[in-house]
Amino acid sequence: MAEVYKDSKIYCCFALNRLVAALGIDLYQEGLEAKIDAILADRDAFVSKEEIKHEIRSNHYMTNKVVEQLLADGFVTVEAVEGRYRIRITKAGILHIRKYNEFYRRIYAEQIRDHYKYAGLPYWFR
């Protein structure tokens, strides 16, 4: 069976959903837009570059490409601390993934199922 091709857009989707999970919020809760600033201020939630690499299940090159794209789009901030990277989602990142998760689910359904075939589908895909 041929491997299903995944591009950096779907990897960005995986990374953003991982960052939302680190915040511990319900992405679809009512009134989220009004709460985002307070949530981001109250919680020091971040993931490492290694955690992003693990989530997207790809190599160092693709991990860097994904992080750089998310940073360029304003969806994350990246802080280097003692040789390690702390990646945090921004308000724009939360609003983007909330708006486009349904689109990603429709367009990339085969790739998402393939990506999570051994771990089980993530909460945001169900």
Residues covered by each model-derived region:
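Short alpha-helical segments that sit at the start of domains
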Residues: M1-D37
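Extended low-polarity, hydrophobic cluster-rich segments
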Residues: I10-L23, V66, I94-F103
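Short acidic, hydrophobic short linear motifs in intrinsically disordered regions
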Residues: L27-E55
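Short, cationic-aromatic polyanion-contact patches
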Residues: L32, V81-F103
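Core residues of bacterial helix-turn-helix
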Residues: E55-I56, A80
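Short amphipathic alpha-helical interaction segments
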Residues: R57-A72
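A short, conserved structural fragment
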Residues: L71-V81
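Short, amphipathic alpha-helical interaction segments positioned at domain boundaries
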Residues: I94-L121
